[in-house]
Design a protein with these regions (language model features):
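Conserved catalytic cysteine-centered active-site region
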Residues: 53-104
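Residues that mark the start of a beta-strand
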Residues: 3, 104-105
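Conserved "HGTGT" condensation-loop signature of ketosynthase/thiolase-family condensing enzymes
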Residues: 1-75
Length: 108
């Protein structure tokens, strides 16, 4: 099995009730994170984007984030919605795909 390394980490603001970001759609918050990550790493090396989101209104919010961040339409995007465990499951999914040889670089 391939070894998996976390190359860096960023987090979006939390748009909860009474916060300054409560009216900002989640895809805008996520797109800001993706833009910064792709400024640090080569976007052409990313073979999939996996994002955990527990307050989405349905649909593939990760796809919206990727497109808004200016990433290629050819990069598949997956949204994981497991209340309270979405982000951890996104990391586990990415790591498992890398270990199995199905992927090289995942943006989570």
């Amino acid at each position: 099995m391939d070894k998996v390394f976390i190359l860096g980490g960023l987090r979006s603001y939390i748009g909860v009730r009474n916060s300054a970001y409560r009216h900002v759609p989640a895809e805008h918050l996520g797109a800001a994170v993706l833009k910064e990550l792709t400024a640090r790493y080569q976007p052409s090396k990313i073979d999939m984007i996996i994002c955990g989101n527990c307050v989405g209104g349905g649909g593939n919010i990760t796809r919206l984030m990727a497109l808004e961040a200016g990433l290629s339409e050819s990069i598949p995007s997956v949204t994981v919605d497991l209340q309270c465990a979405s982000s951890l499951e996104a990391v586990i999914t990415a790591a498992a795909r890398i270990q199995s040889g199905l992927a090289d670089l995942r943006c989570v």
